[in-house]
Amino acid sequence: MSLFKGSGVALITPFKDEESVDFETLGRLVDFHLEHKTDAIIVCGTTGEPSTMPDDEHLEVIRFVIDRVAGRKPVIAGVGSNHTKHAVYLSKKAQELGADGLLHVTPYYNKTTQKGLIEHFKEINDAVSIPIIVYNVPSRTGLNVLPETMKELAKLPNVKAIKEASGNITQVAEIAMLCPEIDIYSGNDDQIVPILSVGGIGVISVLANILPDETHDIVEYFLNGEIEKARELQLKLLPIIKALFIEVNPIPVKEAMNMMGFNVGKPRLPLTTMTEKNREILKKALVDYGISVKE
């Protein structure tokens, strides 16, 4: 059984001016997604900035979101690390907190080989009993999960899915061919329809932070056979998607949410606020779509 079909929001983490987590705003964001069409909540994925959180804060954010959701939608915890024992520790803690699944980015910086990648996930698999989503994002990690490697990972009983953000549709198709038992989620908002077309069942989305219903609708249209509607909506959203990645994620999406009145604060250093030029491009994309923004 799939963790979810449709749109899983890669939830941002709001911060106060002194950079502590703004749990009051975080609660409102969770409620926003519970009230809209978001199908799953991914907490402390890349967009949630876990790389600048100590473990106690990281786990407290996960706990807070799980408790706030209270079983109404699946909560998937981002607990990846380039240190296998650390990844195991975070995975066990997230499972204890009640996470429905785990999102694991591949090891980064030290990178490893494909063999090391398999051994890394074996250790994690053996430590937990909830579904694991492998997160392949070579642009950030310097490591690509090859289709043949994913075939080996699919033999692990808790590895159930892959978030594919390689940008390589041929590779995604090969994974779908070699691993029919594995659920595939697009990791790129501009490739939702292409990945659905080769067997994907959803997206783990930055866009869903600001347009949860539309992001869900792309997937629902496609899976219901309304391919043209899905295609049209994917293309209609493309200017906003491009603007959301005009600088490193999550800088633009946080700026967009602030423009929309969510008051989520700034990202933590080393991420900075947007340049004024790019901010105006983002603002125009939002306004052109019909989103009300603060001046």
Swiss-Prot record:
Binding site for pyruvate: 47, 204
Alphabetic keyword roster: Amino-acid biosynthesis, Cytoplasm, Diaminopimelate biosynthesis, Lyase, Lysine biosynthesis, Schiff base
Alphabetized InterPro entries for the sequence: Aldolase_TIM (IPR013785), DapA (IPR005263), DapA-like (IPR002220), Schiff_base-form_aldolases_AS (IPR020625)
GO cellular component: cytosol
Subcellular compartments: Cytoplasm
Alphabetized PROSITE patterns for the sequence: DHDPS_2
Top-level enzyme category: lyase
Marked site positions, Part of a proton relay during catalysis: 46, 109
Catalytic activity field: L-aspartate 4-semialdehyde + pyruvate = (2S,4S)-4-hydroxy-2,3,4,5-tetrahydrodipicolinate + H2O + H(+)
GO BP terms: diaminopimelate biosynthetic process; lysine biosynthetic process via diaminopimelate
SUPFAM superfamilies associated with the record: Aldolase
Active-site residue numbers: 135, 163
Molecular function terms, GO-annotated: 4-hydroxy-tetrahydrodipicolinate synthase activity
Location, primary (coarse class): cytoplasm
EC number: 4.3.3.7
Pathway where it operates: Amino-acid biosynthesis; L-lysine biosynthesis via DAP pathway; (S)-tetrahydrodipicolinate from L-aspartate: step 3/4
Function: Catalyzes the condensation of (S)-aspartate-beta-semialdehyde [(S)-ASA] and pyruvate to 4-hydroxy-tetrahydrodipicolinate (HTPA).
Assembly: Homotetramer; dimer of dimers.
Protein family according to the UniProt entry: Belongs to the DapA family.
Protein's recorded name: 4-hydroxy-tetrahydrodipicolinate synthase
Organism: Caldicellulosiruptor bescii (strain ATCC BAA-1888 / DSM 6725 / KCTC 15123 / Z-1320)
